[in-house]
Amino acid sequence: LLQLLGSQNDMATIRLGKDRQYRKSISSLFPESRRPSGLRKTRVSYNSLAHRTTWLRSDLEDVQQGDALIVFTKRAVLDIAGRLEASGRKASVVYGSLPPEIRRRQIKLFTEGKTKVVVSTDAIGMGLNLPVRRIVFMQTDKFDGKSRRPLNVSEVKQIAGRAGRYGMYDTGYVNAMGGEALDYIRAQFENTEPKISRVSLGFPHVLLDMAEPLNTILKIWKSVEPEPPFEKISIDEILFLYERAYKAREDIDGFEDKHTLYRMLTCSIDIKNRDIVWLWLYYCQTYTADICLDFPTLEMCTDAGLMKYETYYKMLDLYHQFSNRIGKNMDVERLELEREKTEDRIMRYLVRDKKNYIQKCKYCGRTLPLGYEFRVCDQCFAASRNRKGRSR
């Protein structure tokens, strides 16, 4: 939180919840700044953050109350939660695409003891206050949008730091599934975090005043290599949306207005969700038709089950975001009502039996091993190869 006070004699205050590397960076930007004594608080000392000497078994039998199991995909979260509940252990779930209110409700179930375990992606390290006794890394690598890579020191420490809670679990524990994974997590946790050597650089809005078309400006900006320590924030999603808008440019009023177009292109949406991209483009084409945008409906979602309601919630967010960016009136009362109804539906899906989310072979229906990367079991894959061999 950056609190800027109006008077020149007042001092600006920055409250940081990050590690020492971030505080050093802020101090270097504001050399006259100081940290008031007595304000820094720690929930649990890293010295008391202990590692288990034995790793978690793949059958999940030694999962304990107060555990947080960490994976890095929504699919894996629901799979593990389903396996736990199949053995009689209720689990809360947390992942990035869940609406904030649903995360809070899931965490409330955990804090009140109605669920014994929480299964989460790395979203658990983002400001959630949990009574977690033990963090268990079920995976030690993640897909970062470009490639699959091992967790780095900062990521391990950010997640591991959720273990322990002052006055309840004074000692936090960190574990992993498998000896090799535990050795890796221990090594990363004991490593020193690298110094912050890069500063993120966003797209300069002043470039929108140039005479060139927006796509030319964006491509030129993407090709520029800034000098260290600056590193450009990716504009790949903006370019993706520009391509979609360009194909429909004849139906978009004010397409040549770079400032308006840029506000539309920078809507924060899930570009991997075809329904969300469709609705975004529809708003681009129809935003001048009335004082309000068309309100999204559940029938616009082509998914089914839980995914359908998660997509609809994203549509409601897009309606709110696009309206604000373009200056359209909103049906606020209806928006709040639809959000509440959708949150309730999502919560019902997550509270009900999760065994349907356990990953099974798409041919024979056998339960796949925990962490299995494929949709077909070894037996069916081998049988398929044998049939192909005989047909030759």
Predicted regions and their residues:
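Post-DEXD/H (motif II) to motif III coupling segment of the RecA-like Helicase ATP-binding lobe
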Residues: 1-44
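Short glycine-/polar-rich loops that comprise or flank the Walker A/P-loop
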Residues: 8-11, 31, 39-40, 64-66, ...
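Conserved strand-helix element at the start of the C-terminal RecA-like helicase core
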Residues: 11-13, 62-87, 91-94, 231
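Conserved RecA-like helicase motor-core motifs
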Residues: 36, 42-43, 88-100
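Conserved helicase motor
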Residues: 73-75, 93-105, 121-125
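Conserved two-lobed SF2 helicase motor
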Residues: 110-129
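Conserved segment of the helicase C-terminal RecA-like domain
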Residues: 134, 141-144, 149-190
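Non-catalytic terminal extensions of ATP-dependent helicases
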Residues: 204-392
